[in-house]
């Protein structure tokens, strides 16, 4: 009975619950996606996949810091053709588990984005455009910090595929509404916010930055308040579904994002703190809250704006 309380519909797609895996370190292989699905996620988001194989940055690429993690992976992936074989291995099993697949993609320009999207379309339920990675020069936030480039990429992908397209936004901008307006004008079906916040850690003994890339993206508890404010602002300005991400560790965190305006949430760093079954734990905590407050999931989305 409780699980039925969490069923949600986004862009015509039914999800058994609104607690998803975020794109990142956990989505590299089909087996990793399956492990997360078994942990209770309503959807799994792949690692960001490009047209060609990419080794990413040299190690060290991740370090734990106060309040979360700094990572500069550099978008490592096997390329879309090889990665689709990973999805193929687990797609039927995920479908039997009623778990949807969100395909995160990146590219250097609109043509590359569109080509990857077309290849991935029949394997996933939603395309998520990574125009927000803060540590891959020429990719990600290089596009997502420019409204014109963001518009061009989103317009090209919307033209290339028929399934819903969401744009994942970077917080590393002066005016995120300007960027969001550009991608909404280009026709995206929804928004994902936020990606990681640019940061750095220095080894005072070695007297140099810890990450090989020098700087990276901060994820985890430290960025939750930033993410919630961005979701709040997006909800105030746009009439498209929003997926909230950044620092979600508990049902209470997820509910905060939903009350700010998110229709669903994604969890990344939280897997390290609470295990693969964090998705079930968060779902159970949301259900308990809804029962205690005599509310429905639909009612809490945007509730803090009333």
Swiss-Prot record:
It catalyses: (S)-dihydroorotate + NAD(+) = orotate + NADH + H(+). Heterotetramer of 2 PyrK and 2 PyrD type B subunits. It comes from Methanocaldococcus jannaschii (strain ATCC 43067 / DSM 2661 / JAL-1 / JCM 10045 / NBRC 100440). Its main location: cytoplasm. Its cofactor is FMN. The gene is pyrD. Pathway: Pyrimidine metabolism; UMP biosynthesis via de novo pathway; orotate from (S)-dihydroorotate (NAD(+) route): step 1/1. The keyword Membrane does not apply. The lineage of its organism: Archaea, Methanobacteriati, Methanobacteriota, Methanomada group, Methanococci. This is Dihydroorotate dehydrogenase B (NAD(+)), catalytic subunit. Keywords: Cytoplasm, Flavoprotein, FMN, NAD, Oxidoreductase, Pyrimidine biosynthesis. CDD domains: DHOD_1B_like (cd04740).
């Amino acid at each position: 009975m409780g699980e039925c309380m969490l069923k949600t519909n986004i862009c015509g797609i039914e999800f058994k619950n609104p607690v998803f895996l975020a794109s990142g370190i956990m989505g590299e292989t089909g087996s990793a996606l399956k492990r997360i699905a078994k942990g209770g996620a309503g959807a799994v988001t792949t690692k960001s996949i490009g047209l060609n194989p990419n080794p990413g940055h040299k190690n060290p690429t991740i370090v734990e810091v106060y309040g979360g993690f700094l990572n500069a992976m550099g978008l490592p992936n096997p390329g879309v053709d090889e990665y689709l074989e990973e999805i193929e291995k687990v797609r039927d099993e995920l479908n039997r588990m009623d778990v949807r697949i969100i395909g995160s993609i990146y590219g250097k320009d609109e043509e590359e984005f569109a080509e990857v999207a077309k290849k991935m379309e029949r394997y996933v339920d939603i395309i998520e455009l990574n125009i927000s990675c803060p540590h891959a020069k020429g990719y990600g936030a290089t596009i997502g910090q420019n409204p014109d480039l963001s518009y061009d990429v989103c317009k090209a992908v919307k033209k290339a595929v028929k399934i819903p397209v969401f744009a994942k936004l970077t917080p590393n901008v002066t005016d995120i509404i300007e960027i969001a307006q550009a991608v909404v004008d280009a026709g995206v079906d929804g928004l994902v916010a936020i990606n990681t916040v640019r940061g750095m850690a220095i080894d005072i003994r070695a007297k140099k930055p810890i990450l090989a890339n020098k700087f990276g993206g901060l994820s985890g508890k430290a960025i939750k308040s930033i993410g919630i404010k961005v979701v709040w602002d997006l909800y105030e300005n746009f009439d498209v579904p929003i997926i909230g991400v950044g620092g979600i560790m508990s049902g209470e965190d997820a509910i905060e994002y939903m009350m700010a305006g998110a229709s669903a949430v994604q969890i990344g760093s939280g897997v390290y703190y609470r295990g693969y079954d964090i998705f079930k734990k968060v779902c159970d905590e949301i259900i308990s809250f809804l029962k205690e407050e005599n509310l429905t999931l639909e009612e809490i989305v945007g509730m803090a704006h009333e």
